[in-house]
């Protein structure tokens, strides 16, 4: 049976998410991000297109590296202003039945005890349609604003994230037994206290006696996403992630990451197929090639190199305004980096431009050759990019048996891993915390 | 012109909020608190009844004082399990147009920088219908679970809350100027960077350079509620609160608090009428007195003394299981305290039982004699208590000109303080932070 492709909409609760400069495009409605209807309309559109999930990126700091200032990011709305993505979920869940919501949250700034409750609450309210994209954040401005005194190195932030997840797993998987809530009216026992356990976590970064504040939600643990392609990031993915958002735009790079993470997963006793691999993709589709190119040119017209340099500075720490084009960063010249960023050719992700058939061919090729399971679909204009994809590419993928015609029933985890799999599999590291008793 | 009474529904994102034992009542649907539709149906009902707001209490710890254990609270669902109230708001805002949402959040556990963004996000999404009930929390179990190493004394927690609010005011009122966002397409300027200011806050508890992550929302600062009646709590209310949730069930007590807080407010240069006073009230109304008494008896039947003792223990720190009835706590014997709690006579708040006329009389009397402006309406059964009030008491109040017939247009602050008052008045302490410039 042909493998169905999973499609997520890649979004962010701000004006300028990724295609910087395009807020100026006449068809772009991103300025409506503060309006609840922008989001409920988007969720309904995505459900109409049978998308798996809305993937919401997030940052809690400002890009202030480029030109040693935050002004370019602020001027061009490069992920600032930026609102809290968790606040959007319940309204979007109310207007949909199947769409899932993968929301980014950093383990660097706020305590796991409060976060574990937020995610359990959202898993309840969405009836099991919530996922968490775990990030370890790297923005100095966020460190300062959250009063982080001791700035941890890149890899140690993943060590902290390991323990952060351990605390969450103990709360989600082990603190309340499945049949703790019994609602015994006769004996006035809503919850059997003997089935609610302290977790007594004592670690390097956190002391959390527990118990969890929430009764078990449909998935208990939200579907875990991870998106860091560094060595340490891939190790973290292999240990924790059920879905990985890969970097890279060509088969070789993607395949390397896919194979590497699946291999590492075995070390943790995990079935490598218990991890779905997502690649970012930019799609500009038209009924004809010319129509697609016309759209591309209209986007290129508003494309802002300055905006992308501000984003690049925040993401890498390199202020390219201080370099000459002949300087090198790693193996690439600054001239080449800047040239790449000045063109709309999908600097980080594969760009597929053309007819529905061409786009479907290129997506199918990446899936089959790189061994990935789905895509995070980038937006140029909102909601136009998704409208085009749903009207033109989805039918083509469905014709090839590569995309669902109707939603399957069940939670997000079941839609990814099959009916009945609404909880994490036993080979996941979280499963060891299921039989926590008070004396742990 | 007769003063209109403001009515809030008093709720909590859990099973057992306040009328412990009544989760067993056949008409009570509180077990549906994990279901999004419970909340959207409630919001629609309250808007039908022209309520001002849904007031959501919250705790992030467990009552574990009574019988030196958390078991009674867990067994009887006394505010555990408890989900996060902020996650509910966007769905309820989506199905209503006027109802406001006053949500409780503690200044003790999570950093103001993340909280300021959450509230700005909700003020945007609700189009100016969000309020924040500021609490300084007191539960040891929450202190442990959030890893609070240094437990602050009661009054010092208010000092920290003062600074917490100062940080938030600087972010909400001063960081982004009203016309910072200009959306100048021609010059690719979404936001004028010179109108986005760092706040450079440096205090005893927080260092927050800023700027805020969010563009100005309709109200900028959510409507500020406060609910602590200690000496320090009233001082805090006088300085910050626009709405105060008073303790007390008789005219004398309520009037003392009202007069005291209004007097203190003058010290801060505030017009005392810029503070609305809310008393808690329990209403059991029937078309006839007998019908009301029948309801009361059905509630009394399920009333749980043990549940209330668990709540009392968590709230006061006194484990009454260790006292004999002749012991005294303050000026009241333990026997009297327990006797009060065993009857459904509104242990903390005024109980009004009877016909619509009697209930309206008693509400009008409290408003006129104690100088209060509205009520937080307690629930016995959900949604029955609110349905009865809306069907029987609201028409009676409307007949007397004491209650709106239709909603006024505008934000929550405008509905409280009049059209055009969507931002904090100039006499509020937050106003001083409006002209923050980079060198503050």
From Swiss-Prot, chains A, B:
Q: Which UniProt keywords apply?
A: Flavoprotein, FMN, Monooxygenase, Nucleotide-binding, Oxidoreductase, Plasmid, Secreted
Q: Name one GO cellular component term.
A: extracellular region
- The lineage's top-level taxon is Bacteria
Instruction: Tell me which SUPFAM superfamilies the record gives.
Output: Bacterial luciferase-like
Practical uses of the protein = Shows particular potential to be used for the treatment of environmental oil pollutions and in other biocatalytic processes. Random- and site-directed mutagenesis were used to generate mutants with increased activity toward hexadecane.
Q: What is the effect of changing residue 102 to D?
A: 2.1-fold increase in activity toward hexadecane. Uses a narrower spectrum of n-alkanes
Give the principal location in a single coarse category: secreted
Binding-site positions, FMN: 58, 137-138, 158, 227-230
| Outcome of swapping residue 63 to F | Loss of activity. Can still form dimers
Question: What's known about how pH impacts activity here?
Answer: Optimum pH is 7.5.
Reaction it catalyzes: a long-chain alkane + FMNH2 + O2 = a long chain fatty alcohol + FMN + H2O + H(+)
* GO MF entry, a single one: monooxygenase activity
Q: What Pfam families does UniProt report for this protein, alphabetically?
A: Bac_luciferase
Known EC number: 1.14.14.28
- List the subcellular locations: Secreted
State the signal peptide span: none
> Do you know what upregulates this one?
120-fold increase in transcription when crude oil is used as a sole carbon source instead of sucrose.
Temperature and function: what does the record say?
Answer: Optimum temperature is 60 degrees Celsius.
EC category:
oxidoreductase
Name the reported effect of residue 146 to R: 2.5-fold increase in activity toward hexadecane
Q: How does it assemble?
A: Homodimer.
Q: Which family does it belong to?
A: Belongs to the NtaA/SnaA/DszA monooxygenase family.
- Briefly, what is this protein's role? Involved in the degradation of long-chain alkanes. Converts alkanes ranging from C(15) to C(36) into their corresponding primary alcohols.
Q: What is this protein called?
A: Long-chain alkane monooxygenase
Origin species, per record, is Geobacillus thermodenitrificans (strain NG80-2)
Gene, per the UniProt record: ladA
């Amino acid at each position: 049976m042909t493998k169905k492709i999973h499609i997520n909409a890649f979004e962010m609760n701000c004006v300028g998410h990724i295609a910087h400069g395009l807020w100026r495009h006449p068809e772009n409605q991103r300025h409506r991000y503060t309006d609840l209807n922008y989001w409920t309309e988007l969720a309904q559109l995505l459900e109409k297109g049978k998308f798996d999930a809305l993937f919401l990126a997030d940052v809690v700091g400002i890009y202030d590296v480029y030109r040693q200032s935050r002004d370019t990011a602020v001027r061009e709305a490069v992920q600032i202003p930026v609102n809290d993505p968790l606040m959007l979920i319940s309204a979007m869940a109310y207007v949909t039945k199947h769409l899932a919501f993968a929301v980014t949250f950093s383990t660097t700034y706020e305590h796991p005890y409060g976060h574990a409750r937020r995610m359990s609450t959202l898993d309840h309210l969405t009836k099991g349609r919530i996922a968490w994209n775990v990030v370890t954040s790297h923005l100095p401005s966020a460190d300062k604003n959250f009063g982080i005194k001791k700035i941890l190195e890149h890899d140690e932030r993943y060590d902290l994230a390991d323990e952060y997840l351990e605390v969450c797993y103990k709360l989600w998987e082990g603190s309340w037994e499945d049949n703790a809530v019994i609602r015994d009216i006769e004996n006035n026992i809503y919850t059997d206290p003997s089935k609610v356990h302290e977790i007594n976590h004592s670690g390097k970064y956190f002391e959390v006696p527990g118990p969890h504040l929430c009764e078990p939600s449909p998935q208990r643990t939200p579907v875990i996403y991870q998106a860091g392609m560094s060595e340490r990031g891939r190790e973290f993915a292999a240990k924790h992630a059920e879905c990985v958002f890969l970097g890279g735009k060509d088969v070789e790079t993607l395949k390397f990451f896919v194979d590497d993470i699946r291999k590492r997963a075995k070390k943790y006793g995990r079935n490598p197929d218990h991890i779905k691999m997502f690649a970012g993709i930019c799609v500009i589709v038209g009924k004809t090639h010319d129509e697609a190119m016309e759209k591309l040119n209209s986007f290129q017209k508003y494309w802002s190199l300055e905006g992308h340099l501000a984003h690049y500075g925040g993401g890498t720490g390199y202020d390219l305004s201080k370099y000459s084009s002949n300087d090198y960063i790693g193996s690439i010249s600054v001239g080449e980096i800047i040239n790449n960023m000045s063109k709309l050719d999908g600097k980080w992700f594969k760009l597929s431009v053309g007819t529905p058939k061409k786009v479907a061919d290129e997506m199918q090729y990446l899936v089959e050759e790189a061994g990935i399971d789905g895509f995070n679909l980038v937006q140029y204009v909102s909601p136009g990019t998704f409208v085009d994809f749903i009207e033109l590419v989805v039918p083509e993928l469905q014709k090839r048996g590569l995309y669902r015609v109707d939603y399957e029933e069940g939670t997000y985890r079941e839609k990814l891993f099959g009916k009945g799999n609404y909880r994490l599999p036993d080979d996941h590291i979280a499963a060891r915390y299921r039989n926590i008793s008070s004396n742990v």
